[in-house]
Amino acid sequence: MENVRNIVTEALGKIKERGGLKAVYFVACGGSQAAIYPGKYLLDVEAKNIPTKIYNSNEFVYATPASLDERCLVICCSLKATAETVEAVKKANEIGAVTIAMTGNPETGMAKVGQYVVTYSNGNDQIYSLGNQAQVLRICFEILHQVEDYPYYDEAMAAYAQIDEIIAGAKRDWLPRAQAFAKAYKDDTMFYILGAGPLWGTAYSMVNCHLIEMQQRNACLIHSGEYFHGPFETTGKGVAIVLLMSTGRTRFLDERVLRFLNKYADHATIIDAAELKLEERLGKHVAEFFNSVVMIPIERYYVSVMADERG
C-alpha cells in the first residue's frame, strides 16, 4: 500500500508541475481491461474534476485521443507483456503522458516500459486484496485522496483487510449453489450475462474470459440498463441467463431485470453481492467500489465448478 501511495504522490507531483491533472486514461485488453474497470467506475462517480476514459490497447495506439498530453495519467495493465498493451504504454510515453504499468511481477515486458510500476498478486493462489482489481482501486483512491481530499479514504483503506475472508467465506458457503448451477447449466451452449455499474467489468470477465475463452461456451454480454432495449425479447423457456447484482447506486437497474426474470424466465441464476453484506463489512460509503474485487472470483468459481461437472 505504501508503494502505491508513493508512486501516486510522485506521479501527481510531476503532473502538478505541468499544470495539474487533466484526465486519467485506463488502457488494457481482455481480462486486464475488466480488472481495471473498477478504477474508472470509482473516479467517474466520486471525482468532481477528474475525467476518465477507458480504451482497448490497440484502439489507443491506432486512434490515440487528441486530448492526451503531458498532464494526463495513463494506467495500463497486462499480467506479462501483451504486445498491444506494451505498445500503448510506449505511445503514451511518446506523447509525454505519465504512465503507470500494472503487471504480474517487476521483470515483465510491461515493467520495462512503464514510468512507474505497480505489481499485483495473480494465479490460482493469489491474494485478492493485492490482485489487479484491488491495486487499481488503491491507485484511484490515492488519486481521489491527494487531488480532491476524498472524505472516505480511510474507510476504503480499512476495507482491504476484509476482502480475502469475504471471498473465502463465499466460496465455502456458496459451494452448494455453485454445484447446483453446474448441474443445471453444464449442457447449455449459449449464456446471457447481465450486469451494470460496479459489476460491468465482472460481467465482461465472465463472458469473454471464463465462458468463451476458458470453457468455449458462447456467451453474450448485456448491460442491465440495456436489457429492456432489445435483449429482453429473447427471454423465455430454457434461455440460460446469469444476472450479477451489485450493491450501491446502480442496483435499481439490476432489480428491474430481476423482477422481469422472476416473471418470464425459467433458467436464470442470480449472483447477488448484497447477500455478502458488503456495506456492513467494507463500509457503506465504499462497498460498491469493491463489488467486482469480490464478485469476479465468485463468478469464476461458479464457472470452475461447472467445468468440473462437465469433466
Q: Which ranges hold each PLM region?
A:
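Structured C-terminal subdomain patch of bacterial secreted/periplasmic proteins
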Residues: K263, A273-R310
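Long, low-complexity, Lys/Arg-enriched
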Residues: T234-G236, A240-V242, S304
